[in-house]
Amino acid sequence: FVLILLQKETGSALVFMAFLLMFYREGMKGIVLLLGALAIVLFIVVIRFSIETIGNEQGSWGVVGAIAIIQLIQIIVPFSSHPHKKESLIFLGLSVLVIVASVIINKWYPVDYNYVAIGTSLVTAIYWAFTGILRRYPKLIAVAFISIGSLVFIYASDMIFNHVLEPHHQIRIKVLLNMEDDPTGAGYNVNQSKIAIGSGGLWGKGFLNGTQTKLKYVPEQDTDFIFCTVGEEHGFWGSALVLIIYWLLLMRIMKIGERQKESFHRVYAYSVASILFFHLMINVGMVLGIMPVIGIPLPFFSYGGSSLWGFTLLLFILLRLDASRLERSR
């Protein structure tokens, strides 16, 4: 129904209306056709006759009102079928909350009607997915989650990039995706880091013999970009050895977590492994130019007392939890 409202041409809206006939033939109630007809009417009245005012308050409120009507009908119909089920009550409350939140957001922070439509229809889409076709075909749940997540990401990424991220964040992402070449500005650190790692070759230039690092071409080489020092001085094999040591540490932490009997101890062990893994992945990734530069330390490697203390305390607490398990088993 929301797709009908989002169309810019009447013909496209009628095509989506035709899909409702297929849903009706597959077993949905006749109300689905009524909702489709109502969506067509609202499309013509709100979109076509107020196309000049879509960007301002009047057009936005018209679209929000039209979508709210569609949403309320879709909420009331399934709720009336199962008024006493707990899941129906929860869904009713969440749906009304989403609609009210969308109206409030549109009042204080006007957005394009596409984002309003996606936000107000998200809860209903999930509800229909779980209570309709997916109950008959449980294996499609993962596919539905991926599809819904992809659609939300497509519509939300542009708004987040333009309205949430700061200008310097946007430049870093553009440099990462090769959308903007700035070797002397935002891309300088990554460019020099890749030169240092590439010049190291297989065996490296030797301990303290790196040219890019020792001549200070690579900024922050003691903290955020310390991995490029390893790559330049010790080459591919030295870098691989460091990554293998990290892998052994993560496997050891996971093994400790697997043998814990209490849920909290297991969750804590997995959390420690996740923290170390993401720090390692992001730090090494940004040094190699495959991750945006966000200034994250390499665990137990980067210079800095606070990060060293933080990671050490995480491991100390994990070892103490494991020791308490051994004490209780005696």
Where do the language-model regions lie?
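Transmembrane alpha-helix interface/packing and boundary motifs in multi-pass membrane proteins
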Residues: F1-Q7, I197-W203, G231, I282, ...
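Hydrophobic core segments of transmembrane alpha-helices in multi-pass, intramembrane catalytic enzymes
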Residues: S12-F23, L35, A39, V64-I70, ...
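Interfacial segments of multi-pass membrane proteins
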Residues: L14-L34, Y127-W128, Q212-G235, L298-G304, ...
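A juxtamembrane structural motif centered on a specific transmembrane helix
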Residues: Q71-V77, E87-S102, N283-R330
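Selective detector of the "anchor" transmembrane alpha-helix that sits immediately C-terminal
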Residues: W237-R252
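Loop-to-helix entry and N-terminal half of a specific, functionally important transmembrane alpha helix
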Residues: M254-G295
